[in-house]
Amino acid sequence: MTRILGIDPGSQRTGVGVIDVDEYGCSHHVYHAPLVLLGQSSFAGRLKQLLLGLSAVIEEYSPKEVAIEKVFMSKNADSALKLGQARGVAISAVVLRDLPVHEYAARQIKLAVVGRGGADKQQIQHMVGVMLNLQGRLQSDAADALAVAITHAHVSATAQRLGVSTKQAWSRK
């Protein structure tokens, strides 16, 4: 089995999701949760809380690979910068443990999980629940993190079958 950690970075909440992928390519739910960062009085405190929270998840679940959502351009420059900083902290927590990081754009994730690059949050939550046989409504950030992990599982399986890298497996060339 391959264990994958999916991360949906955020400066207020960061979603984390862990799945196992068996030898047949089936994904199995292990863990998901939002890391809520709003309890800190400063932004630096939130980043520290994010680093410690992700480190604890990595320590407890021992993923072999990590997939993270890429930053999208926002109309609010301050929000985009904070998101980029949170994403940098998340990647740092991963690379400090010598784990491979795979990055996917939001449209790629939506296409892989829902079949439509313009899917909305509810569609992602629903499909992640169906794919992982989960009951009840998933919290949005955690569902997004599981979706990133599922996307990587699918792209990785395709890359392995084709004998190419995950970047090449996603490419249309």
Swiss-Prot record:
GO biological process, one term: DNA recombination
Enzyme class: hydrolase
InterPro entries: RNaseH-like_sf, RNaseH_sf, X-over_junc_endoDNase_Mg_BS, X-over_junc_endoDNase_RuvC
Keywords: Cytoplasm, DNA damage, DNA recombination, DNA repair, DNA-binding, Endonuclease, Hydrolase, Magnesium, Metal-binding, Nuclease
Annotated GO MF terms: crossover junction DNA endonuclease activity; DNA binding; magnesium ion binding
Keyword Secreted: no
UniProt-annotated catalytic positions: 8, 69, 141
Reactions listed under catalytic activity: Endonucleolytic cleavage at a junction such as a reciprocal single-stranded crossover between two homologous DNA duplexes (Holliday junction)
Compartments where located: Cytoplasm
UniProt: Mg(2+) 1 binding residues: 8, 141
Keyword Signal: no
EC number per UniProt: 3.1.21.10
One Gene Ontology CC term in the entry: Holliday junction resolvase complex
Cofactor(s) required, per the database record: Mg(2+)
Record Pfam families: RuvC
HAMAP family: RuvC
Family note: Belongs to the RuvC family.
UniProt xrefs under NCBIfam families: ruvC (TIGR00228)
Described function: The RuvA-RuvB-RuvC complex processes Holliday junction (HJ) DNA during genetic recombination and DNA repair. Endonuclease that resolves HJ intermediates. Cleaves cruciform DNA by making single-stranded nicks across the HJ at symmetrical positions within the homologous arms, yielding a 5'-phosphate and a 3'-hydroxyl group; requires a central core of homology in the junction. The consensus cleavage sequence is 5'-(A/T)TT(C/G)-3'. Cleavage occurs on the 3'-side of the TT dinucleotide at the point of strand exchange.
Quaternary structure, from the entry: Homodimer which binds Holliday junction (HJ) DNA. The HJ becomes 2-fold symmetrical on binding to RuvC with unstacked arms; it has a different conformation from HJ DNA in complex with RuvA. In the full resolvosome a probable DNA-RuvA(4)-RuvB(12)-RuvC(2) complex forms which resolves the HJ.
UniProt name for this protein: Crossover junction endodeoxyribonuclease RuvC
Organism of derivation: Xylella fastidiosa (strain Temecula1 / ATCC 700964)
Gene (name only): ruvC
